[in-house]
Curated annotation (Swiss-Prot):
Keywords of this entry: Cell wall biogenesis/degradation, Cytoplasm, NAD
Protein name: UDP-D-apiose/UDP-D-xylose synthase
Record-level GO BP terms: cell wall organization
Domain of life: Eukaryota
Length: 398
């Protein structure tokens, strides 16, 4: 075959890492490959590298275009393995055959943390234990996806609201190697997720210290983009409550007011999925710089309150859809009303970017409005007609 007809990834072995070394093709066991992050990472690896991916998940809807069947140019590059890591003996075999395991599997929807705390703890800690064990025992590298929730509350949140130190960065900017992890009381089961994620981080770190496990831990700060979460009643349960962007998207698609929990005063940062995937790509191909590291991956420039996010999404969706906003586009609801008993929250989550910038030279690029336009355009094209049909059927049967 001539080079002109080769797929883009065919020459990937000639690429160099950040230290000028050739990048050898890897075999990657990607657990949770069928989800939001996994689907984008699979696309990136198939388009730009020669790596081979064992895509492990219980569903493949978001990567069906890659695996069912694989396009001719990806033959032998990606394979789907339908298994549940809770109880499938095939998992160890896949990890043994791989050079690198990436674990994306998790329950990571805030509405589940205090309504399904046992499932949340089991999914994020107990079910992750065999993955760590198999990697450690077989001397395989692990990239484990954690969460920015492990930081919990900021130090500044314990100061009076008018205290001048609340505005000082050292009281709210979150640093991987310095910031304490501060959670609420046990009765606030919202912290079940953060505690489980922190404990598996500590176990991975201990495996590295005592048994030489090569690992990288990723702490995502609100990664946003197409294929995130689900729209209730369309490609997810009708009673399901996805994360904030999908919740607001669902409201906009149905022309319902956006629900602001406790007034929407919490502050968050948001990063575009394609920017974040570039950071993960750098971790994969620069093990000497990534091993033993914990990386914040977010965009501190895209900080807004949840209320401001709702306002921006309302404006952007009106432009995308051509539909004017509602006269009353937002309503306030209490956290108890929206999430149930046991909910608690962190006031602010701003990532420090020093370590990832120093080790990998990575910085996010996409402004918040641009990523919202891309995401809401996708949501509108993907879901609007299905929601119209659903609403019309509900109206006819009532």
């Amino acid at each position: 075959m001539s080079s002109s007809s080769s797929p883009p990834a065919a020459s990937a072995a000639a690429r160099l890492d950040l230290d000028g070394n050739p990048i050898a093709p890897l075999t990657i066991c990607m657990i949770g490959a069928g989800g939001f992050i996994g689907s984008h990472l699979c696309e990136k690896l198939m388009a730009e590298t020669a790596h081979v991916v064992y895509a492990v998940d219980v569903y493949c809807d978001k990567i069906r275009h890659l695996v069912d069947p694989a396009p001719p140019h990806l033959h032998g590059r990606i394979s789907f393995h339908r298994l549940n890591i809770k109880n499938d003996s095939r998992l160890e075999g896949l990890i043994k055959m791989a050079d690198l395991t990436i674990n994306l599997a998790a329950i990571c929807t805030p509405a589940d943390y205090n309504t399904r705390p046992l499932d949340t703890i089991y999914s994020n800690f107990i079910d992750a234990l065999p993955v760590v064990k198999y990697c450690s025992e077989n001397n395989k590298r692990l990239i484990h996806f954690s969460t920015c929730e492990v930081y919990g509350k900021t130090i500044g949140s314990f100061l009076p609201t008018d205290h001048p130190l609340r505005k000082e960065p050292e009281f709210y900017v979150l640093k991987e190697d310095e910031s304490p992890c501060i959670f609420g009381p046990i009765v606030k089961q919202r912290w079940s997720y953060a505690c489980a994620k922190q404990l598996i981080e500590r176990l991975i770190f201990a495996e590295g210290a005592e048994n030489g496990l090569e690992f990288t831990i990723v702490r995502p700060f609100n990664w946003i983009g197409p294929r995130m979460d689900f729209i209730p009643g369309v490609d997810g349960p009708s009673e399901g409550v996805p994360r904030v962007l999908a919740c607001f998207s669902n409201n906009l698609l149905r022309r319902e007011p956006l629900k602001l929990v406790d007034g929407g005063q919490s502050q968050r940062t948001f990063v575009y999925i394609k920017d974040a995937i570039e950071a993960v790509h750098l971790m994969i191909e620069n093990p000497a710089r990534a091993n033993g590291q914990i990386f914040n991956v977010g965009n501190p420039n895209n900080e807004v309150t949840v209320r401001q996010l709702a306002e921006m999404m309302t404006e952007v969706y009106a432009n995308v859809s051509g539909e004017p906003p509602l006269d009353e586009p937002m309503i306030d609801v209490s956290s108890k009303q929206f999430y149930g008993e046991g909910y608690d929250d962190s006031d602010k989550r701003i990532p420090d970017m020093t370590i990832i910038n120093k080790q990998l030279g990575w910085n996010p690029k996409t402004p918040l409005k641009d990523l919202l336009e891309t995401t809401l355009t996708y949501q509108h094209k993907t879901y609007k007609e299905a929601i119209k049909r659903q609403m019309s059927q509900a109206s006819a049967s009532s």
